[in-house]
Amino acid sequence: MMCGFASNQSPKKLSSKKSSATNVHLEISPVKHHPPCKVYENVQGSCLDSAICTTVAKCADLTDDLPVHNKENLLHRLNDLETNSYEEYSALQDSGYSSILQNDSPCQDETDRKVSDIQVRETPKNFMSYQRPFHTLSKINLPILRFEEAVCSTLKKMRKTNKKIDWNAVDVVCGGNYGLEHLIGKSMGLERFDILAELFHRDFKHLLTKILRHLSAMDLINVISVSTTWRKLLQKDNWAYNAYKLGCKELCEKRAKVSSHTATRDESLCRVPLASVQKVAASSLCTSKKQSKNKNGGLSCNRLAEFIEVAQTLKNDQSLKVCVDCGSPAKHDPCLHRAICTRESCKLDFCTRCSCKYHFSKSCLMSKPGSYRIPSEPLPGSKKSKQNLRRL
C-alpha cells in the first residue's frame, strides 16, 4: 500500500515557502508581511514535527482496517449495496406503502401513532362529554324549531296508530309553552297594531317613558281616554301622570274663562215674556257654587265640561237644570216646568216643581208640604229689580 509520507523522511526538508503559505491562510487579512524571527521558526518547526508524527500514526491505523484496494473487492461491495437497497424497496412495496420522501420509514410511522395516542389520552373526559353538535344547540335556542319538532313527533306517533291526521292533537301541542308569542314578525301584515300595549305587556318601561316625554299635555289627555291599558301605562309613569293632571286643570280654567261671558241670571216664572228675547243659560260658575252648597265637594272637570257643551246647544227659551237621578245636565223649559236629562243612559223626563215624572196638565203631587216654594217677584226699587232693568 502506498502512503503519503515515508517514515524515513525528515520534516526539516520542508521548504519555508510552504510553511509561510500555511501561516498566511490562518492570519486575518494582514496588511504587511514581516519576515519571521528565528525563534518563531524554531518553535514552528517543532510543532510541525509533532503534528506530522500524529497524522502518520493515524493513517497507519486506518490502513490496517481498510480492505485492499483492488478491482474484485470493489465489485463485491457494490453488489452488496444493490441487494440491500432492493430488499428495502421490496419490503415497502409488499406493505402497500411507499413514500417519495427518503426520510419516511416504518419507525417514523410508529412514533407518529404513539404521539397521536398520547394526545387523545391527554384530552379530559369532562370536556369531551360537554361538547355538543351545532344542530342540537340551534334547536334548543330557537323556539320555532322546538315547536316544529314537537308537532312532527306527535304526528309520527299518530300515524302509527291511525292513518288519518287528527289536527286536535296539533292544537294541544300549540297550547304548550314554546315562547312563540315573542317571535319576531308574528304581527306582520296587520292593518292595526297597538305598539304601546305590546311594550307595556313586555315591561319595556324605559321605552314607554321616552315616548311619553315627547307628548304634550293635550296628547296625554287623549292617550288616557283611548283604552284601559293606555290609562294604566300612563298612571304608572309619575311624570306623565302629573303632566296630565296639570293639563286637565289648565283646560278647565280656559273653558271657564271662555264661557264667563255667557253667564246669565237664573230663570224665574215672571220672566216668561222675555225668554224669546234674550238667551237664558246657567252660568258654569253659578252652577258649580250651587252644587258645592247642595253637595259636599263640587263638580269635577269632566262634569263641568259636559255642562258647558250642553249650554252651547240651548235654545233661546231654554236653560239648564241638574238631573235628579244622575246629576247630569238637563234641558229645562220654564214655560212647561219640564226638564229632560241629556245623558243617553238616563234621559229622565221630570217636573221641575215636584221633581217627579212629568205629569203634563195634572197638578203636582207634593210629597212634603213646603218643600217646593214658588219664587216671589222682586219688589219694585229693590236691588234685584234694578239688575233686571239694567239687563234689559
UniProtKB/Swiss-Prot annotation:
Q: Where does Zn(2+) 1 bind?
A: 323, 326, 341, 346
- UniProt name for this protein: F-box only protein 5-A
State where composition is biased (Low complexity).
7-20
In this chain, the stretch annotated as Disordered covers 1-21
Query: In the UniProt annotation, what is the result of changing residue 356 to S?
Result: Does not inhibit APC
Gene3D superfamilies assigned to the protein according to its UniProt record, in alphabetical order: 2.20.25.20
Reported impact of residue 123 to A: Not mitotically degraded. Delays fbxo5 proteolysis. Does not affect pin1 interaction. Impairs pin1 interaction. Impairs pin1 interaction
Which effect does the record note for changing residue 354 to S? Does not inhibit APC
Q: Which domain of life is it from?
A: Eukaryota
The record's keywords, sorted A to Z, are:
Cell cycle, Cell division, Cytoplasm, Cytoskeleton, Metal-binding, Mitosis, Nucleus, Ubl conjugation pathway, Zinc, Zinc-finger
**BP GO terms, sorted:** cell division; negative regulation of exit from meiosis; negative regulation of meiotic nuclear division; negative regulation of mitotic metaphase/anaphase transition; negative regulation of ubiquitin protein ligase activity; protein ubiquitination; regulation of cell cycle; regulation of mitotic nuclear division
Impact of mutating residue 105 to A?
Not mitotically degraded. Does not affect fbxo5 proteolysis. Does not affect pin1 interaction. Impairs pin1 interaction. Impairs pin1 interaction. Impairs pin1 interaction
Pfam families documented for this protein: F-box (PF00646)
